[in-house]
């Protein structure tokens, strides 16, 4: 939900982009004293070790995330936006913005995550402003399953037919939003070649957020390209009333509080 919170905030001004600036300087060897050169070499070595350590930590965290995600997931929003939970939404909104504003807040929040277009169609539709995210599953996916022990991600359609089942390996981090990037070990994985996973789990945020597709670069873009205005959200197929209540409360709090 932390990722969706950032996206909703940015979507309000249609500014889902950021830049990472890296500076460096260099000098000639002849103009650097031996002591300074040694110090520089030591600094470079230290930076390299720190970077290597960060990579190791991210890779370990990615493996842990797959373990924590072990289980099966269905689309989030059809579950928690069902009519039977509307009063829960209104109660949580009331606690944050007051009874007189609760219904409007609920309508606004729900509208931002229930868009019905994504990709280039969404880019065209929202060219003059506005915009809502499509947060469902794509490519006929109905149930997504993680097996952390074998690093396997698989999916089935609404009839239970297997759409894909591959082992995946960690390939890096998305620097802006902190998604863990995984790539299939199978050459022909189509739209399930890459999975970008937010660090959300059922235990901590009561839901998960992720993207998947065949183009890693396009998956890093949120307001352009074939995956624009799309962020899949899921909830455990074993979710209970408590998990649903907690998920609704978290979403309201992160987007309406203070």
Show the residue positions of the predicted features.
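Generic short beta-strand segments
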Residues: 75-81, 156-159
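Internal, charge-rich low-complexity segments
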Residues: 79-114
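Bacterial lipoprotein signal-peptidase II cleavage site
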Residues: 21-36, 40
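Sec-dependent N-terminal signal peptides of Gram-positive bacterial secreted proteins and lipoproteins
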Residues: 2-27
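N-terminal helix-cap/turn-to-beta initiation motif at the start of protein domains
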Residues: 56-74
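A composition-driven surface/loop motif
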Residues: 25-28, 55, 66, 91-96, ...
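Immediate post-signal-peptide N-terminus of mature secreted/exported proteins
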Residues: 40, 51-57
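Calycin-type beta-barrel ligand-binding domains and close structural analogs
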Residues: 125-258
């Amino acid at each position: 939900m932390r990722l969706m919170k950032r996206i909703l905030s940015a979507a309000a001004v249609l500014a889902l982009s950021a830049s990472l600036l890296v500076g460096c300087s260099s000098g000639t060897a002849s103009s650097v004293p031996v002591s300074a050169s040694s110090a520089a070499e030591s600094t470079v070595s230290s930076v390299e070790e720190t970077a290597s350590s960060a990579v190791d930590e991210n890779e370990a965290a990615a493996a842990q995330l797959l373990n924590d995600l072990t289980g099966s997931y269905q689309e989030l929003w059809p579950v928690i936006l069902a009519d039977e939970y509307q009063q829960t939404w209104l109660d949580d909104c009331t606690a944050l913005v007051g009874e007189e504003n609760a219904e409007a807040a609920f309508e606004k929040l729900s509208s931002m995550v229930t868009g019905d277009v994504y990709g280039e169609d969404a880019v065209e539709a929202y060219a003059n402003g506005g915009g809502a995210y499509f947060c469902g599953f794509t490519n006929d996916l109905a149930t997504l399953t993680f097996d952390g022990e074998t690093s396997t991600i698989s999916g089935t359609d609404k009839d239970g037919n297997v759409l894909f089942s591959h082992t995946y390996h960690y390939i890096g981090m998305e620097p802006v939003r902190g998604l863990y990037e995984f790539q299939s070990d199978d050459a022909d994985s189509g739209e399930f070649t890459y999975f970008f996973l937010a660090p959300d789990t059922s235990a901590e945020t009561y839901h998960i957020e992720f993207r998947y597709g065949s183009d890693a670069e396009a998956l890093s873009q949120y307001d352009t390209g074939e995956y624009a205005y799309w962020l899949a959200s899921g909830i455990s197929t074993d979710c209970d009333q408590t998990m649903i209540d907690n998920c609704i409360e978290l979403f309201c709090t992160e987007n309406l509080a203070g």
